[in-house]
UniProtKB/Swiss-Prot annotation:
It comes from Homo sapiens. The chain crosses the membrane at residues 11-32, 196-215, 288-304, 310-328, 349-369. This is Ceramide glucosyltransferase. A motif (D1) lies at residue 92. Its EC number is 2.4.1.80. A motif ((Q/R)XXRW) lies at residues 272-276. Residues 33-195, 305-309, 370-394 are cytoplasmic. The active site is at 236 (proton acceptor). Coiled coil: none annotated. SUPFAM superfamilies: Nucleotide-diphospho-sugar transferases.
């Protein structure tokens, strides 16, 4: 009996520690957002002396927003940069979009590369290789096709690239779009995702997504260049790790990496979350324990039980109050990341928040059930440590 009592006391202590850690993450993310995001960065060097940047743009297929998203990169207010458009397939309709923009902006240093170069299983790396090999500037900016920028985005990122910084990344967010699926995405990327993303980076953990990353090319080359990361599906994590292992720091842009895909749905969002969870479990096995207990509903039950065990508080009352506080703080976080008025109502937020939180266990269990992922045009079986093998149809 004494052993059981000791175990229960230990579980209660764990519940209170979980409470402190999760709410510390809430406060860190909100404070950082208020102090850093959506602020104009201080110019650290004269405009004319800003270093050259090679932009690598991987393209696959066309959606309704592609041409508008791409055009924002041709309209950057930056003294010296090149745009390297990379398309894998010769019959990809994205080629026509690229040619249209190349004709419209003849004064922009831009080139189109078709065909890619097979160097590993990662299709994004294979697509980018021809552009990477001819990149002429010391800074490489890898930016996904669905990202939209404003004229001073690149200037902001380069200003963060100080002497000891080797990688500058943007916090992923989502542009205002129509429909509930867009609201669901915006709620996720404005609440749960930045809470973990920001708190991890603030506390020294290297958490980077490859949607918009500015890196020193010489540091990447020291690590073996892009080809060294072609064996991984989550190439962004391993590129960031290689840069950190060489003693370089990371910095976050004051502007978000604004996703503006024209193709979106609830099922696409769910599939994307499952894929990301599979990758995290594969790279960081501790995710199996940490991820479920850090979500609102599960965490509230654990902490509620601890409060009941120690203070005899009603579990369900505590659960409801804790979820309500989480819900309110998430809304504060979302407004901070948005940097302005939201395009949906508080009722839409409440519904999207509840559905997103309710999906978490299903997403996690689905990721555990099947270790294979589908990405772009291929299917891959994940291996322990982050590598993968392509599943070929016989």
């Amino acid at each position: 009996m004494a052993l059981l009592d000791l175990a229960l006391e230990g579980m209660a202590v764990f519940g209170f520690v979980l409470f402190l850690v999760l709410w510390l993450m809430h406060f860190m993310a909100i404070i950082y957002t208020r102090l850093h995001l959506n602020k104009k960065a201080t110019d650290k060097q004269p405009y004319s002396k800003l270093p050259g940047v090679s932009l690598l743009k991987p393209l696959k297929g066309v959606d309704p927003n592609l041409i508008n998203n791409l055009e924002t990169f041709f309209e950057l207010d930056y003294p010296k940069y090149e745009v390297l458009l990379c398309v894998q397939d010769h019959d990809d309709p994205a080629i026509d979009v690229c040619k249209k923009l190349l004709g419209k902006y003849p004064n922009v240093d831009a080139r189109l590369f078709i065909g890619g170069k097979k160097v590993g299983i990662n299709p994004k790396i294979n697509n980018l290789m021809p552009g990477y090999e001819v990149a002429k500037y010391d800074l490489i900016w890898i930016c996904d096709s669905g990202i939209r920028v404003i004229p001073d985005t690149l200037t902001d990122m380069v200003n963060q690239m100080t002497e000891k910084v080797g990688l500058v990344h943007g916090l992923p967010y989502v542009a205002d779009r129509q429909g509930f699926a867009a609201t669901l995405e915006q709620v996720y990327f404005g609440t749960s995702h930045p809470r973990y993303y920001i708190s991890a980076n603030v506390t020294g953990f290297k958490c980077v997504t490859g949607m918009s990353c500015l890196m020193r090319k010489d540091v990447l080359d020291q690590a073996g260049g892009l080809i060294a990361f072609a064996q991984y599906i989550a190439e962004d994590y391993f590129m960031a790790k290689a840069i950190a292992d060489r003693g370089w720091r990371f910095a976050m842009s004051t502007q978000v990496a604004m996703q503006n895909s024209g193709s979106y749905s609830i099922s696409q969002f769910q599939s994307r979350m499952i894929r990301w969870t599979k990758l995290r479990i594969n790279m960081l096995p501790a995710t199996i324990i940490c991820e479920p207990i850090s979500e609102c509903f599960v965490a509230s039950l654990i902490i509620g039980w601890a409060a009941h065990h120690v203070f005899r508080w009603d579990i369900m009352v505590f659960f409801m109050c804790h979820c309500l506080a989480w819900f309110i703080f998430d809304y504060i976080q979302l407004r901070g990341v948005q940097g302005g008025t939201l395009c949906f109502s508080k009722l839409d937020y409440a519904v999207a928040w509840f559905i997103r939180e309710s999906m978490t266990i299903y997403i996690f269990l689905s990721a555990l059930w099947d270790p294979t992922i589908s990405w772009r045009t291929g299917r891959y079986r994940l291996r322990c440590g982050g590598t993968a093998e392509e599943i070929l149809d016989v």
